[in-house]
């Protein structure tokens, strides 16, 4: 992918990159080592003077990831030249990890890019736990990723929980920490990191409630921990008290 801009005043290339093309300072530094900048077709450094009428181009091509592309179902809810919104199924990682390089959403997305002739990267703007399903936003290049991260507002989830929250609507303000230094699990603890989640009960039936949840901070397992702390664990959550024998899995869905 390429960004292009025609200068309308005397300035330096760095000013065009930051103000006109809105590249982050981190991306500007990264791209300058890739010979990504040209002015009137000639390679240029960020301190080069730029005059009115000069054409600035930025190549955003990135090295192909070292994990494999895979074919498989991919539910694309929205796509344009900069981003996609994908409906991630339950039980799938968003991105490969050290111990798992296949079977993730990113593997399937690479396969989709190959089939559609797109030389794009995989930059998750939002990440969901393996057992959380719903909407994942992914940028196609580092520039779009930075812009989407900066513009991202509150995320909204729906969750089926055991019990009826009291009050039915409110704010959970409870710090979250590791259960122990070596544990991957979290808990509410006074010495934890600040964590806030808004909740609203949408419906209650037979001792099960449907909640709308908005995490206002971004702690690991935040919604799962907060719901359990509220006394209403998410159904199907085996780690925080909501496991159901033979049930449909963790009932937490990202909706927007």
Which residues does each predicted region cover?
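RNA pseudouridine synthases
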Residues: 1-256
């Amino acid at each position: 992918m390429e960004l292009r801009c025609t200068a309308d005043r005397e300035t330096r290339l760095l000013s065009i990159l930051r103000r006109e093309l809105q590249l982050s300072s981190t991306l500007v530094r990264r791209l300058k080592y890739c010979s990504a900048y040209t002015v009137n077709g000639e390679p240029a450094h960020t301190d080069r003077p730029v005059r009115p009428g000069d054409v600035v181009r930025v190549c955003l091509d990135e090295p192909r990831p070292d994990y494999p592309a895979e074919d498989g179902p991919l539910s694309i809810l929205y796509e344009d030249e900069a981003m996609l919104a994908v409906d991630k199924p339950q039980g799938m990682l968003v991105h490969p990890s050290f111990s798992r390089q296949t079977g993730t959403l990113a593997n399937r997305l690479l396969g989709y890019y190959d089939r559609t002739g797109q030389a794009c990267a995989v930059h998750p703007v939002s990440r969901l736990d393996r057992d959380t399903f719903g909407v994942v936003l992914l940028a196609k290049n580092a520039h779009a990723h930075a812009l989407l991260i900066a513009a991202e507002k509150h995320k909204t989830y729906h969750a089926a929980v055991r019990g009826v929250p009291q009050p039915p609507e409110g704010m959970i303000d409870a710090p979250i920490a590791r259960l122990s230094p070596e544990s991957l699990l979290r808990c509410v603890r006074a010495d934890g990191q600040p964590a806030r989640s808004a909740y609203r009960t949408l419906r209650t039936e037979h001792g099960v409630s449907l909640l709308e949840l908005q995490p206002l901070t971004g702690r690991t397992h935040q919604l799962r921990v907060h719901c359990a702390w509220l006394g209403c664990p998410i159904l199907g959550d085996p780690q925080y008290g909501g496991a159901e024998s033979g049930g449909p899995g963790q009932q937490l869905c990202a909706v927007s």
